[in-house]
């Protein structure tokens, strides 16, 4: 089976990979008969955004851990 690498960067339209775009990309790869292999940088996000207000937050999040939300844990560090 052909494998296609997908690089994600966090999870969220303002501070990471846009969820709809990522999921539809993974679906298209699957429907084409290939296997998606997902990767993300294992580092802290530069900015964390409150998606309800659009304002920056002071907390920190890891890019790899946030991207794992989209892939349900099936992701490798870059």
Go through each PLM region and give its residues.
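Extended, subdomain-level signal for the structured scaffold at the beginning of enzyme domains
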Residues: 1-78
């Amino acid at each position: 089976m052909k494998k296609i690498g997908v690089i994600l960067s966090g999870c969220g339209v303002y501070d990471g990979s846009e969820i709809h775009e990522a999921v539809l990309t993974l679906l298209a790869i699957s429907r084409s008969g290939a296997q998606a292999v997902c990767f993300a940088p294992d580092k802290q996000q530069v900015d964390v955004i409150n998606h309800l207000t659009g304002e920056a937050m002071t907390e920190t999040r890891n890019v790899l851990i946030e991207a794992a939300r989209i892939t349900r844990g099936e992701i490798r560090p870059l």
